[in-house]
Amino acid sequence: MSEEELAKGLALRRKVLGGDYVDRAMAAADEFSRPMQELSNEFCWGHIWSRPGLTRRERSLLNLGMISALNRPHELKLHVRAALNNGLTREVIREALLQVAVYCGIPAGMDSFRLAKEVFVELDTGAG
């Protein structure tokens, strides 16, 4: 494991997902789960998210579609927040989720809309 990539990944993960979230995830890591956190920091964030070929905004847009299709509600809520942090508007998120509904099915779209709306309500009310 490259310490440089790990540090770069952790810094980018904090920017995109928010420092509080990442701090909680890292603090909760134990002997069993720490390798998964380190893999995410180094490979996902240090190698892939930091590549020059796509902007963070574009990567967030892609993630919304893929995570919706995979039916990963916790990760979708997290990445709706990340998408907003990376400059996507609620309108762009809505359009992405409409695209999900057409290509992944109405149930996937409905669930994704419900989860995104929960994030928006949390942000609007200061609950998140």
Language-model-derived ranges and their functions:
Residues 1-57, 85, 111-128:
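Acidic, glycine/proline-rich low-complexity segments that act as flexible tails and inter-domain linkers
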Residues 16-19, 73, 87, 103:
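Residues at alpha-helix boundaries and the short loops/turns that link adjacent helices
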Residues 20, 67, 107:
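Gly/Ser/Thr-rich beta-alpha loop segments that engage phosphate groups in nucleotides
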Residues 40-44, 61-68, 96-101:
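Short alpha-helical scaffolding segments that buttress acidic/His motifs in well-ordered protein cores
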Residues 56, 60, 106-107:
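Short, conserved micro-motifs enriched in small and acidic residues
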Residues 61-64, 68-94:
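Mid-chain, well-packed structural core segment of small domains
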Residues 82-86, 99-102, 118:
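Short basic/hydrophobic patches in alpha-helices and adjacent helix-turn junctions
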Residues 102-112:
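C-terminal structural segments of small proteins and small subunits
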